[in-house]
Structure formats: structure tokens, C-alpha cells
Regions:
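Thiamine diphosphate
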Residues: 1-202
Length: 202
């Protein structure tokens, strides 16, 4: 089996505009305020879009983006190369909120992460069996993993009653409602969704 680069984990720190390839370079006194994580191609793209929304609106919030390529019954990674508990703390910190979008059932990921540090702080959203959908964005929204769902949950996790953050959460709900209305009326996603320019990391 081919070894996954960096254990199949991609890390980007927004406040440094930097990819992290050496986990030993992560400093405990330079931690993010929150973490956006994803496993699965479509939900990762949506998480990247959520990061872009947040960077535009609340650039002062330090956000770590994490993509997890491989999961197994033992944890993050493969059976041969599973992420250790100490490396998990380096990457996911001890106590920062984690918003995790998953391409499978949320309870599956919850059981995989159970033995890692402080799993109660990890908000997981994944596949839910909810009726028929009209467009890709509609499907993401029904599963609560759209960019606006992720951005709203991220702000709620650090808002501490901040009025600006709370008004932005309402704005994200409105943007989502507008995008869904367009999708259901036209059977295609709105241009701002369809033509989104995703952040490039390479």
C-alpha cells in the first residue's frame, strides 16, 4: 500500500497563510481560534469555501483548515499508520472547537474520533437520509455541510455573544436560504455557488 504523504493529512493555517508539512513546527503558543476539518472531496471543497467566507468577514479569527484523507477503525490514517494521540493534539489542539464535515454518517466518524483528546468539542455533520434533492448545493445543505452551515457553526463556536458574529450567522442563513430558493426554482445552483473561485493551496 502506497504511503500517504504526511499521513494523508493536509493542514493550512489561515493567519500565517501557510501549509504545515512538518508537525513538529506547530507551536503550542501559536494555536488557532478554531479548526475547520473535512474528510471527503465534496465536503472539503465546501469547507474551503466556508474558510473563504470567514476570511472575508472575520479575518481576525485564526482558523486552521485540515483535510483528512484516510480513516480506519483505529482512528485517523490507515491501520498501518494511524495518527497518534500526541500528534492529534499537535494538529487539532487540546481544546479548540472543531467543525468537522464528513462524507459519511456522523456517528461513524464520532466512533473513530472517540479515543482522541476531548472529542466532545468536535461538531460533526455528515450524511443524513433526507428526501430527494435538486442540486449539489441542495444536497450539501440538507446534510448541514454547506459552506454557510459550516461558517455559521464556526462563528457560533467562538462568538461568546459578539453581536457582529451573531449578525453574520443570520446573514449566512439568509444567503443559504436564497441559494436554496434559486436551486429549487431553477433546478441548478445559483451562479455565485456554481462559479465559486476556490482557494488554491498548490
Amino acid at each position: 500500500q502506497k504511503q500517504l504523504e504526511n499521513g494523508g493529512i493536509f493542514i493550512f493555517d489561515s493567519w500565517k497563510n501557510q501549509k504545515i508539512t512538518d508537525w513538529d513546527s506547530i507551536l503550542e503558543d501559536d494555536e488557532p481560534d478554531l479548526i475547520l476539518a473535512a474528510s471527503g472531496d465534496y465536503v472539503f471543497k465546501e469547507t474551503v469555501a466556508a474558510l473563504q467566507v470567514l476570511l472575508h468577514d472575520v479575518a481576525q479569527v485564526k482558523i486552521r483548515l485540515i483535510y483528512v484523507q484516510a480513516l480506519c477503525g483505529k482512528g485517523i490514517g490507515t491501520f498501518e499508520n494511524t495518527l497518534s494521540k500526541s500528534d492529534f493534539v499537535k494538529i487539532f489542539t487540546k481544546d479548540k472547537p472543531v467543525i468537522f464535515a464528513f462524507h459519511g454518517y456522523a456517528k461513524t466518524l464520532k466512533s473513530i474520533l472517540f479515543d482522541y483528546q476531548n472529542p466532545a468539542r468536535i461538531q460533526i455533520n455528515g450524511y443524513e437520509e433526507k428526501g430527494s434533492t435538486t442540486t449539489p448545493f441542495d444536497m450539501l445543505a440538507r446534510n448541514k455541510v454547506s459552506r454557510y452551515d459550516i461558517a455559521a457553526r464556526a462563528l457560533n463556536s467562538v462568538s461568546k455573544g459578539d453581536e457582529v458574529f451573531e449578525s453574520l450567522v443570520k446573514e449566512y442563513r439568509k444567503r443559504q436560504d436564497d441559494a436554496l430558493r434559486f436551486a429549487r426554482e431553477n433546478s441548478v445552483d445559483a451562479p455565485e455557488i456554481e462559479n465559486w473561485g476556490y482557494l488554491k493551496f498548490y
